[in-house]
């Protein structure tokens, strides 16, 4: 379902990442990506760093601070098309020294929040457009910027969200429940949308 991304990988620097989860609970993966800290280094009692660790740290490190140190506090911005309090991101991103976290319910909310068909989540196309707006705001500046985007389009649960889902007919999986089959079909179509939307985003 992702031919564009696979093609892009063949023509640029790319690799594989072993993810400890998908579709949900991704705040832990987000924490590891932003800080470089593997959760395996912590005690097993640490389940969600965003809720248990970062709010209690006085000066936690994250990679975006490289930009903050060089270009000033306005050089790093985050976008998450959901609620700001989820996983305490509104607290944690301030700790990480992001200048602003744009969410659906932030004081200055996201402009683009459209969905696809019956999906309850903001589409990746809309999420990318919010990022493009931030890029275009700074296009005449000589300062580099760090933009963090955490999307929601392919988050669980996977209902019957999409019309004209070609993966329903293509699914030949055996020995799975109807619920599992529906999850697979919806996830595959969501990834397919992400694939096209990512290609469109990079073209811009």
Describe these PLM feature segments.
Residues 1-204:
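Solvent-exposed soluble domains appended to multi-pass membrane proteins
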